[in-house]
């Protein structure tokens, strides 16, 4: 029996699919439900000179992410306990959230396209996370 379900979303058009699937599970188990989005920290990826104010860009992205998470949470008929946003290594951020919020099921999506076969973030997460995972296949049309 699950007590707290965490849905990892990328805030794409597939995010509601994942959340609705998790809502069904949460209702059956009377579990808490939370969502998380992990942003890539752009300043960590580029080491050369750039001609933009990185902190103002990250602030804008963070504000947009929070609004998107709120909109997503309001799109379902189930209370969302936590709306989390993090940046950095996907596996580490998810591990930290799982530990901090006592999560026992992680729901994530997996694109079934050429690039995902080569570089899957889901595979990295599966090797990091120590709780049950539901990996929902997302087909690219």
Swiss-Prot record:
One Pfam family, short name: Usp
Keywords: Cytoplasm
SUPFAM superfamilies per the UniProt record, alphabetical: Adenine nucleotide alpha hydrolases-like
UniProt keyword annotation of Acyltransferase present: no
Major location (coarse): cytoplasm
Any single GO CC term annotated in Swiss-Prot or TrEMBL for this entry: cytoplasm
Similarity annotation: Belongs to the universal stress protein A family.
Miscellaneous notes: Unlike MJ0577, UspA shows no evidence of ATP binding activity.
Quaternary structure note: Homodimer.
Protein name, per record: Universal stress protein A homolog
Species this chain originates from: Haemophilus influenzae (strain ATCC 51907 / DSM 11121 / KW20 / Rd)
